[in-house]
Regions:
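Acidic, low-complexity intrinsically disordered regions
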Residues: 1-188
Length: 188
């Protein structure tokens, strides 16, 4: 049996719980399951018809699960991941929110990076690295995906890291930048 004070203390130090007012708490799973969020794939990802998840699902999914193990669903079906070469610059940008000390380990420990060990890197990073990715064509249901379109996401299961994804068409040509897009970029 746990006293009320002990339970409160445990909840206050847990990384899975948000402390509210008047000694009330809510779990991350309770806050983020079913909530919508979005991101805009980079030009490189659009050109390669594949996205890297990286930090884009933080804080919505369980932080104990690495991004290459997240289960992606689209139109009620599991989207199978694959492996593809991406520029190291994109990889570094896409994992940046994990923090400076964690970016490189997350990138090099990706399950698709089977040929390049972190210990083999001497003085400079490789230009490209093989990472786990998900095909945009499967997420978009076979419809064309354009640079500027967004991926709309919703956590289906926080504990199992299941994320539903669909495409929000920007409705703009590649040459037109909307006011909303400018504001979104400024916010990010």
């Amino acid at each position: 049996k746990v006293s009320k004070n002990d339970a409160s203390e445990i909840l206050q130090v847990s990384e899975y719980v948000f402390s509210l007012v008047k000694n009330e708490f809510v779990t991350k799973a309770g806050v983020f399951t079913g909530r919508w969020f979005s991101f805009k794939p980079s030009r490189e990802e659009v050109e390669k018809d594949s996205i890297i998840i990286g930090h884009r699902c933080i804080p919505f999914v369980n932080p104990e699960v690495p991004p290459d193990s997240i289960c992606v669903m689209a139109e009620g079906n599991v989207v199978e991941s694959s492996a593809r070469e991406f520029s190291m610059n994109l990889a570094m940008d896409t994992f940046a929110l994990y923090g400076e000390g964690y970016v490189i380990p997350y990138i090099f420990n990706d399950k698709s990076n089977t040929s390049l060990a972190l210990s083999s890197v001497q003085y400079s990073m490789p230009q490209e690295i093989r990472l786990t990715c998900w095909p945009l064509s499967k997420i978009s249901g076979g419809k064309p995906f354009h640079y500027g379109d967004r991926i709309i996401c919703r956590v289906i299961s926080w504990s199992d890291c299941v994320v539903e994804m669909k495409v929000q068409d920007s409705g703009l040509s590649d040459m037109v930048i909307s006011d909303e897009a400018v504001q979104r970029e400024e916010w990010y």
